[in-house]
Design a protein with these regions (language model features):
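Active-site loop/helix belt of alpha/beta enzymes
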Residues: 1-95
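Charged (often Lys/Glu-rich) extended helix/loop segments that serve as interaction or gating elements
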Residues: 82-164, 169
């Protein structure tokens, strides 16, 4: 007994599935989680505990939780900026989220500082400018060049066709 505590709900966020690229794989895994949440709700009800809130869902999975009939709220938030890693996640039509359902809202402007090495350019956006804990950035609107590595202050861009010039903006 804890008279000052009120049980108000469940937190059922499945964080490790948020960045699963394949839509069908995410759905399969979320269906299993939703089933477990239903079992938990049934158990709570059988014990006389009301569960008004079931919270969970994220940018990569909210459609599954929202349509489950089990969750009362979703916690998606990364969609507001749509980072590159969430952008790589595929929707039900097999398209990247950042090229279908969501659009990028936050960008980093970088300049090319060097093109001394054939097939490679150096830009001024490294680790001090961006986070790479969920993968390297994607160069917006450019499928012909690829950001391949970075140090504290510089990024390396693969430019196989040697198109980039010093002071080009990306």
């Amino acid at each position: 007994e804890a008279e000052h505590l009120i049980f108000d709900g469940l937190q059922a966020y499945h964080g490790s599935i948020q960045h699963e690229l394949d839509h069908d794989q995410r759905k399969t895994e979320l269906d299993a989680v939703i089933k477990k949440v239903k079992v938990c709700l049934d158990s709570l009800a059988a014990s006389g505990l009301n569960c008004p809130v079931v919270s969970g869902g994220g940018t990569g999975s909210f459609l599954f939780e929202a349509s489950s009939g089990v969750y009362t709220e979703v916690q998606c938030g990364s969609y507001a900026f749509m980072d590159a890693d969430y952008g790589r996640v595929h929707n039900r039509d097999g398209k990247r989220l950042d090229r279908a359902d969501w659009k990028n809202a936050l960008f980093i402007l970088t300049s090319i500082m060097s093109t001394a090495k054939d097939g490679q350019a150096i830009c001024d956006a490294g680790l001090k400018v961006q986070s790479v804990d969920s993968g390297l950035p994607v160069i917006f609107g450019r499928d012909d060049i690829t950001y391949v590595s970075c140090s504290d202050e510089h990024g390396v861009i693969e430019d196989k066709q040697n198109q980039l010039k010093i002071n080009d903006k990306l």
